[in-house]
Amino acid sequence: MCATFELTGERKINKQGVRLYRIRATRDIAARGVRAGDLGGWVSSTHMTTGELRIAKDAWVSHEAEIFEDACVTDSARVGGHARVCGHTMISGYARVDGWSRVYGRAHVFETAVVDGNARVGGNARVLGAAHIHDHVQVRGEACVAGEASLYDRVCVGGQARISGSAYLCGRAVIAGNAAIAEDAYFQVFETLETFEDSVELIRTALPNGEYGAQVRIGTWIGDIGSVVDQLFLCWQRHQHARCSQSEWMERALQIRSRC
């Protein structure tokens, strides 16, 4: 396959110490609205170590985006902005990686998925379907985000977790292990409190009737607001060496409950 781009004489050393070259289109790429002669982003070479083209004939890398190591952009995918794609990653299908996002490791972003903002996708994670990953979201490990799922703010998805359907996650939610969130789920950590040695997160969730409910996460425990006092009492029993009395601990529990 003939390359649709060439390396120009413009070069730089990036923050990882890799020499990069700005690219220029050698023919029109209608799928990406690119004209012959247009300047693009930065790559470390025209081909990967496997001998395959780093950028497929209908794909494009634009603006200040960087593609290096054994990363590639195939099919009709696009990488732009100040995005950085490295490792053994693949951006394929009609996927788009933009903003200041990073895709690394052996991650795969494909179909019509979008990764932008300051998002990070790494490890063996997969982002596919029409999923949108924004802001400071992190997807790593063996996690998979698919369907029309949307992740915002500082959500972190790891382990072998799977997010799909029209799920909407925001705030500081952490989804890991073998967790699965699907359909029209709404999950938001809207406040994180510190209660001595235990982190307490207030979580807002969508109820079947369309209204919003609330839950609380204390460590690995998640339960209804009505159980907060009992659960924090168990925390106090577990941490009796903490420099606080039972009454002080329970007073804090009631304060947290009142804020839910």
Where are these regions (language model features)?
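Terminal amphipathic alpha-helical/low-complexity segments used for targeting or macromolecular assembly
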Residues: 1-58, 64, 82, 94, ...
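Structural signal for interior beta-strand "rungs" in well-ordered beta-sheet cores
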Residues: 48-49, 53-62, 66-193
